[in-house]
Amino acid sequence: MATDTLVDDIYRMIDTKEIPDGVPIEQVINDFGENVKQILRNNITESKFDKRKLRMSNIGKKDRQLWYSYNGYKGEELMPHTRIKFLYGHLIEEMVLALTKLAGHDVTHEQKQVEVQGIKGSMDCKIDGVLTDVKSASPYGFKKFKDGSLINDDPFGYVDQIKGYAHAEGTTDVGWLVMDKTN
């Protein structure tokens, strides 16, 4: 299958309940359940990680922000509703990947650990061989992915993040799979 039909394939599968032959339905469902349990477990028991380390997920952040983190300055504590928003994003990512599999697309390299010159990260996956970063976004953020303006207005560093994963994998075949979290 090709990634250019991915969204339509998911919608078709949801609408018709027809899952392509060969898709291990029960395995996908069981894996989804286990992954959701782990996400919740991590979010309610996870201890703080060392923010002084540069990671793929923060290489696109502003230099000043990275400097403060690296030098141990504490920023504002995240509010509980913000933590829940991040949890929601992780759950959406897992759901989207399960739907991708159920629609018959090949999802590999999930959470593969990569490294470029000592900077480590966990790429989301490859879908049909394409390095893919899965995101949930507000309608405003979603529009940036859809119209391509993210390349010039990227407050979260997503472009640099995916470039880092691409460099580690030796590929230029990359993309985002983004869900508008309000629709």
What does each of the following model-derived ranges do?
Residues 136-138, 180-181:
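A short beta-strand motif that forms part of the nucleic acid-binding face
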Residues 27, 152-156, 164-183:
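Metal-dependent nuclease catalytic regions and adjoining charged, substrate-binding loops involved
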Residues 102-105, 137, 167-174:
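Alpha-helix capping at helix-to-loop junctions
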Residues 1-131, 138-156:
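Metal-dependent nuclease catalytic cores that hydrolyze phosphodiester bonds in DNA/RNA
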Residues 126, 131-134, 173-178:
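A structural signal for short, well-ordered beta-strand segments and their strand-loop junctions
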